[in-house]
């Protein structure tokens, strides 16, 4: 199903501006493969204009408009944005759905989370005022010291296509709460709702240049943003390969980065579980958002005593999933985002089969859907740890399975990856869950569930899944620079040097 989409330009300095080179990129509905509109394609020239606007926003009126304004002032704008997002939720959810293929119910949930995230960081912006000049205890009573928390400055925010508006908000909301000025570069595969965020900012009167939104290709817009000398920090969510390039570029300017990269997360299921409850979490953990989740628990590690029955149950659950146009009522699996992603996922499945794995279910296009980038939920068994399907991130509705006999073996299998974003364990033995939780090498651990995410809790990985934390108070700290202020308060001279002789 196709619906009309707004025609937008780049959002720079509080207004809509055509790209300097007047380039545009077609928008393809992944459910119908139809071109439904286009978005502007920014280049280096537009990045320069946007960065200049952001710099001006920080210094306008000696910073009083934004950077040095109270957190309470910034909070009012964030709450106004949240209210507008809630007001526009129906149309935003539909745009998200036709842009990236996400089922409409999921998209609506995401938009609720967008509003909630802006509200949360409005609260933290207000609390930031009380954290200023926090005293530092010193061992010498001739000095007193305090800490200031100041905005890092101009920040480049590069975001993915699987949660277009939500993951943009994970960066935009704390950056603005901190007093930074931002340039948001969303993925060219799903930018529609991010452009609508620009319209919302205009409607609420956000000061010009505080948030600039540049759509476009990575090499043409993302790379110039990451390497721009006047961008003080880059925050990126996406592939490990691109994250590595951003780190390399930032190193030349000694620029801080925070990176949330790929994953190949495990879900360990022990023998003492309720099979149906565990089966639902297993499919939710891998097939939510059409399987396109950086933290997807796409490696299912089953106790050997329940493996056969568990897989039988999970296949029955999968057969009950409604695969359809994401705007249809009750859809629980839509298309993957693009033709390129569709072909990549099918290649993973083909390689697994050629390496000796078994396709237990799925692995191809659903028979009832002749158009669109749809792939059936897929389970792959008879997997070995040297296979590509075990080691590499698929980013699609594909679950690979191995069995274990001991807790130690389960932990070894779970940690057998270069990634470390998420990990999950399901067991009725909570002491065992605690042991396994401590043994997991991951930044996020779920116990008796998979994938729940809350704005209040930190999000980020270890190993090649990146570093830095988003969300919670940690997300705000990402965009703050800590300044130490120490004052000598004694009336006595310092007395380290011999004073010159008096004349």
Curated annotation (Swiss-Prot):
It catalyses: 3-aminopropanal + NAD(+) + H2O = beta-alanine + NADH + 2 H(+); 4-aminobutanal + NAD(+) + H2O = 4-aminobutanoate + NADH + 2 H(+); 4-guanidinobutanal + NAD(+) + H2O = 4-guanidinobutanoate + NADH + 2 H(+). Disulfide bonds: none annotated. GO terms for biological process: cellular detoxification of aldehyde; glycine betaine biosynthetic process from choline. The active site is at 260 (proton acceptor), 294 (nucleophile). One of its GO terms (cellular component) is peroxisome. Its main location: other. A motif (Microbody targeting signal) lies at residues 501-503. The keyword Metal-binding applies. It is found in: Peroxisome. CDD domains: ALDH_F10_BADH (cd07110). GO terms for molecular function: aminobutyraldehyde dehydrogenase (NAD+) activity; gamma-guanidinobutyraldehyde dehydrogenase (NAD+) activity; nucleotide binding; protein homodimerization activity; sodium ion binding. Dehydrogenase that catalyzes the oxidation of several aminoaldehydes. Metabolizes and detoxifies aldehyde products of polyamine degradation to non-toxic amino acids. Catalyzes the oxidation of 3-aminopropanal to beta-alanine. Catalyzes the oxidation of 4-aminobutanal to 4-aminobutanoate. Catalyzes the oxidation of 4-guanidinobutanal to 4-guanidinobutanoate. Forms homodimers. This is Aminoaldehyde dehydrogenase 2, peroxisomal. It comes from Pisum sativum (Garden pea).
């Amino acid at each position: 199903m196709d619906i009309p989409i707004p025609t937008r330009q780049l959002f720079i300095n509080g207004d809509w501006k055509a790209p300097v080179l007047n380039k545009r990129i077609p928008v393809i509905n992944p459910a119908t493969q139809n071109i439904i509109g286009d978005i502007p394609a920014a280049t280096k020239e537009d990045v320069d204009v946007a960065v200049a606007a952001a710099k001006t926003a920080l210094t306008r009126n000696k910073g009083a408009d934004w950077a040095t304004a109270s957190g309470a002032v910034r909070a009012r704008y964030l709450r106004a944005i949240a209210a507008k997002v809630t007001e526009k939720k129906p149309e935003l959810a539909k745009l998200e759905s036709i842009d990236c293929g996400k089922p409409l119910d999921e998209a609506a949930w995401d938009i609720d989370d967008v509003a909630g995230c802006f509200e949360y960081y409005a609260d933290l912006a207000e609390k930031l005022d009380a954290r200023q000049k926090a005293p530092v205890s010193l061992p010498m009573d001739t000095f007193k010291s305090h800490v200031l928390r100041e905005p890092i400055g101009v920040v480049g925010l590069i975001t993915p296509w699987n949660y277009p508006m939500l993951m943009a908000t994970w960066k935009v909301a704390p950056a603005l709460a901190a007093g930074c000025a931002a340039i948001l570069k969303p993925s060219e595969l799903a930018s529609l709702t991010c452009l609508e965020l620009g319209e919302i900012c205009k409607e609420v009167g956000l000061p010009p240049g505080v948030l600039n939104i540049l759509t476009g290709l990575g090499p043409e817009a993302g790379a110039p943003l990451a390497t721009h000398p006047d961008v003080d920090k880059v925050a990126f969510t996406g592939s490990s390969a691109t994250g590595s390039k951003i780190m390399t570029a930032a190193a030349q300017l000694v620029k801080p980065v925070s990176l949330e990269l790929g994953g190949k997360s495990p879900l360990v299921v022990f023998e003492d579980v309720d099979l149906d409850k565990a089966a639902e979490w297993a499919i939710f953990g891998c097939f939510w958002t059409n399987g396109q989740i950086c933290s997807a628990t796409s490696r299912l590690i089953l106790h050997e005593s329940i493996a056969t029955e568990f897989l039988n149950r999970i296949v029955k659950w999968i057969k009950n999933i409604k695969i359809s146009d994401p705007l249809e009522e009750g859809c629980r699996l839509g298309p993957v985002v693009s033709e390129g992603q569709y072909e990549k996922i099918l290649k993973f499945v083909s390689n697994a089969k050629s390496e000796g794995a078994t396709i237990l279910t799925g692995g191809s296009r659903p028979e009832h859907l002749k158009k669109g980038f749809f792939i059936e939920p897929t389970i792959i068994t008879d997997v070995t740890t040297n296979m590509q399907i075990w080691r590499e991130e698929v980013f699609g509705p594909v679950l690979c399975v191995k069995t274990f006999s001991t807790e130690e073996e389960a932990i070894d299998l779970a940690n057998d990856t270069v990634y470390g974003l998420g990990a999950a364990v399901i067991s009725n033995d909570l002491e065992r869950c605690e042991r396994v939780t401590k043994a997991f090498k991951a930044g996020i651990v779920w116990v008796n569930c998979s994938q729940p995410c809350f704005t209040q809790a930190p999000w980020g990985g270890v190993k090649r899944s990146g570093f830095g934390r988003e969300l919670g108070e940690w997300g705000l700290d990402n965009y703050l620079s800590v300044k130490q202020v120490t004052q000598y308060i004694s009336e006595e001279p310092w007395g380290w040097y011999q004073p010159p002789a008096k004349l």
